[in-house]
Amino acid sequence: MKLTPKELDKLMLHYAGELAKKRKEKGIKLNYVEAVALISAHIMEEARAGKKTAAELMQEGRTLLKPDDVMDGVASMIHEVGIEAMFPDGTKLVTVHTPIEANGKLVPGELFLKNEDITINEGKKAVSVKVKNVGDRPVQIGSHFHFFEVNRCLDFDREKTFGKRLDIASGTAVRFEPGEEKSVELIDIGGNRRIFGFNALVDRQADNESKKIALHRAKERGFHGAKSDDNYVKTIKE
């Protein structure tokens, strides 16, 4: 018997669903994986039987488990369950939205935030730098990118930005369209300030000596706004 990877996945799902069903019958509260497997396996089997439509199974999928059938917090983790099931007229995606209703209990790890603004990077001194995109393509900079090493087509005082990042929320970014000029706020990078990667201009501890090396590298590689002593000679073993 030769099975495709998809067929093997469905067999594994069937086994997991049957195991979850037996545990439910024993009164064992199901975890996340077991709950998803039970719902998915049931839909897959009913679709194969060919007596119910996809729409009917979407509704039926919401009746298989109650809040008391699963561990605390599991219901809130499962926003939807989607399974590609084989019907008599072909494969269809059956999506069950909110398959388990919440029981009103607190969700493990849930956060309740105050109804007020959150101050980010509080207590950190910020510097303002004017930046212009002299290139012909948009450039987007993430919150924790070492600003000194951003795209070479961004023109600004690179020395002023050494060891700094954008003063914006984590995971967000600032975008510069071609020819656009605007000011950004920067703060010091935290931690032990060992900067590696990015455009490989530093790759060491961020101190005054490494700043000189980085400026020299940036100027040699054509990064706009990088100024260094033309007579500078590296004296630090890299």
From Swiss-Prot:
Zinc listed as a keyword: no
Pathway: Nitrogen metabolism; urea degradation; CO(2) and NH(3) from urea (urease route): step 1/1
A GO MF label: nickel cation binding
GO BP annotations listed: urea catabolic process
EC number: 3.5.1.5
Activity at various pH: Optimum pH is 8.0. Active from pH 4.0 to 10.0. In unbuffered solutions, the dodecameric complex is active at pH 3.0.
The reaction(s) this protein catalyses: urea + 2 H2O + H(+) = hydrogencarbonate + 2 NH4(+)
Region Urease beta, annotated ranges: 103-238
Keywords: Cytoplasm, Hydrolase, Virulence
Induction pattern: By nickel ions.
Region (Urease gamma): 1-102
Transmembrane segments: none
ATP-binding listed as a keyword: no
Location (main, coarse): cytoplasm
Extra remark beyond the main annotation: The novel dodecameric structure of the enzyme may allow it to remain active at the cell surface at acidic gastric pH. Within this dodecameric structure the 12 active sites are clustered within the interior of the proteinaceous shell. This may allow a high local concentration of ammonia within the enzyme which may protect the nickel-chelating groups from protonation.
Assembly with partners or alone: Heterohexamer of 3 UreA (alpha) and 3 UreB (beta) subunits. Four heterohexamers assemble to form a 16 nm dodecameric complex.
Family (UniProt): In the N-terminal section; belongs to the urease gamma subunit family. In the C-terminal section; belongs to the urease beta subunit family.
Function: Ammonia produced by ureolysis increases the gastric pH thereby providing an environment permissive for colonization of the stomach.
Protein name: Urease subunit alpha
